[in-house]
Amino acid sequence: MAKTAEPKSKAPTAKTPAAVPRTASKARESARSRRPGTAPAYQHMPAGATFFELSRLMVVGIDSAKGQLIQKAQTSPNGPWPSAWSVIAPGAWVIMTAGLTKDGRVAVVAQPSGTTSLSFVTEDANQIGPIDKWTAPVGIGAPPGAFSYQKLSMARDADGRIEIFLTDNLGRVWWIYQNPDVIVQVQKTITPPGTTTPIVVTVDELRPPAQPWSAWIQLTGQLVAITALRQADGRIALFGINSGLNLYRCQQAKAQALTVADWTPWVQIDAGYPFTEMAPIIGPLGGTNLFAMTQQGQVLHTKQLPAGSDTWTAWATPGYSRVPKYTLCAGIRGDGDIMLVASDQQHVHSFNAQYDAATQNWSGWRDFNASGANTRLSLDYNADGRLALFSMMIQNDGTNGLWTINQMAMDSSEWEWTWTALATSNLKQITVVRDLTPPV
């Protein structure tokens, strides 16, 4: 959604009815593979190597008018977007988040209207044909005493099990997880090699647990926002902001965390700066990186050093912003390096590309587009490694529209000029996920 002033392509502004962004060109380049002789900054993959992952991008959201839980996904890896949204589950919904199951299917946890009990739904494991099928919602209960929820977050743990975190109306932090498989002893009859006499042996086997989900467990702390991230070693890290705009982190102390005691204590890490946004992500060296936005609109950076440890670097800046920024997202480029995208208070979008993780060398903030109103940004990569930027922009009726553009090539500094409209209004909330079980 570019600004209304030329030469940028037009988008809806706060004073005009929502409209599809006007394009400067309808041409779209196909993805280009890395060429020999690329700059040293892009040498994480061999020169000339191509990138491909069997995946497609999907947006899960809630419809503002009917409260429907809906989704829209690329029709194939790197493929186009359909015109219509599809309903995931019947009924009206209040808040949701999405992630992936152990086998790569999209999973959604959401609150149905009229109840505090949350529901869990996944893509059907037996997909046949191009039409997405979803399992029936399964209730996973509600945290005791919760009346509403401020933020939901989902991550897979070291075993691939889904863990869900939330903050409730009182700022309490809650956790629920899929129970691990249990070991049972079974007797089997076998015939040892070189003999003809069967014998009975006892072996250990993994079986699904009797109860699929744990009870709701209250973690320590009081937060208004929380984000969960699976780290390189499989342990989950949590990042949170409280009502005083203080920033905190903690992580699982061991790979299979089942109790509150299996978490490290919360550590306040704001160094006195009030923070409003956070974007944690795993970097190319395996360490967890946290990018966070101060109340003054500057993006700061800290990271684990070494990777997997509980020691972090001092706050640093990947680039100063003359115009304060208000929204931030982080993604991984095809070569494994980090890409940041932010929008400033003049609604100008800029990116900041990591050139070298070891030396923390960055491109600096580079303007590349704009919007006509406040927006929320998300980044994820296509099957060919090109990043896709999603911009959910506020409309005159108080709902949101959603548009997307791609990098012109993997690791490119150029972006498509034409925004693809996924919705021109009527969205309440979205989450972008990478479906690892696309139709092919």
Model feature map: region roles:
Residues 1-36:
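Intrinsically disordered, polybasic Lys/Arg-rich low-complexity tracts
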Residues 22, 26-440:
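A structural motif
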